[in-house]
């Protein structure tokens, strides 16, 4: 356990950030899953709507530093490619 006041503060800050990042990552996974489920169901309209909803969430996670910007770009690219297979 930390003895210094500053170390105790950093522990609290880390816990807060971890919880916030966990929430963002969970939301991100949910939106990606919705796109994949729509594609699996071969529902083009639902897949496009799900993709349109997922892209801002992915970009938001990247801007908050939860995922790397390259990871976000790759995810958006792959999901878009997946949705375009239905058209």
UniProtKB/Swiss-Prot annotation:
Ranges for region Disordered: 1-23
GO CC terms of this entry: cytosol; small ribosomal subunit
Keyword Hydrolase: no
Keywords carried by this UniProt record: Ribonucleoprotein, Ribosomal protein, RNA-binding, rRNA-binding
MF GO annotations: small ribosomal subunit rRNA binding; structural constituent of ribosome
GO annotation, biological process: translation
Bias kind Basic residues: ranges: 1-11
Family, similarity comment: Belongs to the bacterial ribosomal protein bS20 family.
Function: Binds directly to 16S ribosomal RNA.
Protein name according to UniProt: Small ribosomal subunit protein bS20
Organism field: Geotalea daltonii (strain DSM 22248 / JCM 15807 / FRC-32)
Lineage, broadest ranks: Bacteria, Pseudomonadati, Thermodesulfobacteriota, Desulfuromonadia, Geobacterales
Name of the gene this protein is made from: rpsT
């Amino acid at each position: 356990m930390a003895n210094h006041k500053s170390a105790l503060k950093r522990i609290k800050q880390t816990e807060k950030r971890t919880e916030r990042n966990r929430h963002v990552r969970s939301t991100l996974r949910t939106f990606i899953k919705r796109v994949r489920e729509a594609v699996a169901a071969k529902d083009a309209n639902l897949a496009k709507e799900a993709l349109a909803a997922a892209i801002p969430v992915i970009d938001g996670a990247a801007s908050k530093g939860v995922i790397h910007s390259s990871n976000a770009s790759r995810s958006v690219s792959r999901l878009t490619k997946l949705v375009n297979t239905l058209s």
